[in-house]
From Swiss-Prot:
Enzyme class: transferase
Source organism (scientific name): Enterococcus faecalis (strain ATCC 700802 / V583)
UniProt gene name: fmt
Tagged with keyword Acyltransferase: no
Annotated Gene Ontology cellular component terms: cytosol
Positions bound to (6S)-5,6,7,8-tetrahydrofolate: 110-113
E.C. number: 2.1.2.9
Gene3D superfamilies from the UniProt entry: 3.40.50.12230
InterPro entries: Fmt (IPR005794), Formyl_trans_C (IPR005793), Formyl_transf_N (IPR002376), Formyl_transf_N_sf (IPR036477), Formyl_transferase-like_C_sf (IPR011034), GART_AS (IPR001555), Met-tRNA-FMT_C (IPR044135), Met-tRNA-FMT_N (IPR041711)
Swiss-Prot/TrEMBL catalytic activity: L-methionyl-tRNA(fMet) + (6R)-10-formyltetrahydrofolate = N-formyl-L-methionyl-tRNA(fMet) + (6S)-5,6,7,8-tetrahydrofolate + H(+)
Protein name: Methionyl-tRNA formyltransferase
NCBIfam families: fmt
Gene Ontology MF term list: methionyl-tRNA formyltransferase activity
Sequence similarity: Belongs to the Fmt family.
Source organism superkingdom: Bacteria
Length: 313
């Protein structure tokens, strides 16, 4: 039986871990990030992967930094045949990558070499890609640069956001991993090197990237909103207060008004001018200190003073 150490952290990784257990692989240990404070009350909370591992009575290791840690030595002492990672969130030192006889592989949520890095799902949507997918690749010292073992694509629809794509890609990832592992173990896969010249990157989203640039087209802003939903959430500013923007609709109407201008405000609708004369309808938002509101709830409540020709930025 193939001995595996699994490394992962968020909900995306849980179905992948559970698929290994259900398929009968010997999961010797699970390495995940330390428990962290979560929410406004800063409640110390285990990672989704830790919760799943404990349900299966697996050994859980939680190094603050795995490089040079006692947990790293523990993984090496376990002498696994293979390390499988999925959104672990830390770099692995060469010492641990070379320890298993089959090496270490990663389940990455993009069609590598596109979108290496920590936010591939976000960028795939923000950049308006029509498809994304999962790549299983060998792990090397350089981030997400290892040779490809297998890859599969799925479409991104205009209804998808980060949440829906994470769910789809997690399922795709576990299916592809279970197809790939027997071939890898049997030595039947010839890894395909990535083309470095085609590599693009998806670093973690910054606060400034979350701010909506109304000079962009309505479609581009829609991509941004969906590519940051449900986290970290796109926002704009109205008269010094922030609005988180949760849902929008690009319209076919056009305008000559300056980008960021409110061009229609009724009891049920709020339209904003965008770049290239395009128009965006706001469907759902969250004013500072409030919960999410439909645009009708907002305009007839805390947003009743919002008027046409006002600006957002």
């Amino acid at each position: 039986m193939t001995k595996i150490v699994f490394m992962g952290t968020p909900a995306f990784s849980v179905p992948i871990l559970e698929s290994l257990i259900e398929a009968g692989y010997d999961v010797q240990a699970v390495v995940t990030q330390p428990d962290r404070p979560v929410g406004r009350k800063k409640v110390i909370t285990p990672t989704p992967v830790k919760e799943a591992a404990l349900k299966h009575n697996l050994l859980v290791l939680q190094p603050e930094k795995i490089s040079g840690s006692p947990e790293m030595e523990k993984v090496i002492d376990l002498a696994p045949d293979l390390i499988v990672t999925a959104a672990f969130g830390q770099f692995l030192p060469e010492k641990i990558l070379k320890a298993p006889k089959l090496g270490a592989i990663n389940v990455h949520a993009s069609l590598l070499p596109k979108y290496r890095g920590g936010a591939p799902v976000h960028y795939s949507i923000i950049e308006g890609e029509k498809e994304t997918g999962v790549t299983i690749m060998e792990m090397v010292k350089k981030m997400d640069a290892g040779a490809i073992l297998s890859q599969r694509a799925i479409p991104i629809t205009k209804q998808d956001d980060v949440g829906t794509m994470f769910e789809k890609l997690s399922i795709l990832g576990k299916e592809l991993l279970l197809e790939t592992l027997p071939k890898l173990i049997a030595g039947e896969i010839t890894p395909i090197p990535q083309v470095e010249e085609e590599a693009t990157f998806s670093p973690n989203i910054t606060r400034e990237q979350e701010r909506i640039d109304w000079q962009k087209t309505a479609e581009a802003i829609d991509n941004q909103v969906r590519g940051m939903r449900p986290w970290p959430t796109a926002f704009t500013t109205y008269q010094g207060t922030n609005w988180k923007i949760w849902a929008v609709t690009p319209l076919t109407e056009t305008t000559t008004s300056a980008p960021g201008t409110i061009i229609q405000r009724s009891k049920k609708a709020l339209w904003i001018a965008c770049g290239e004369g395009t128009v965006l309808q706001i469907d759902r938002l969250q004013p500072a200190g409030k919960g999410q509101l439909t645009i009708q709830e907002f305009l007839n409540g805390v947003g009743q003073n919002v008027a046409e020709k006002d600006k957002v930025d």
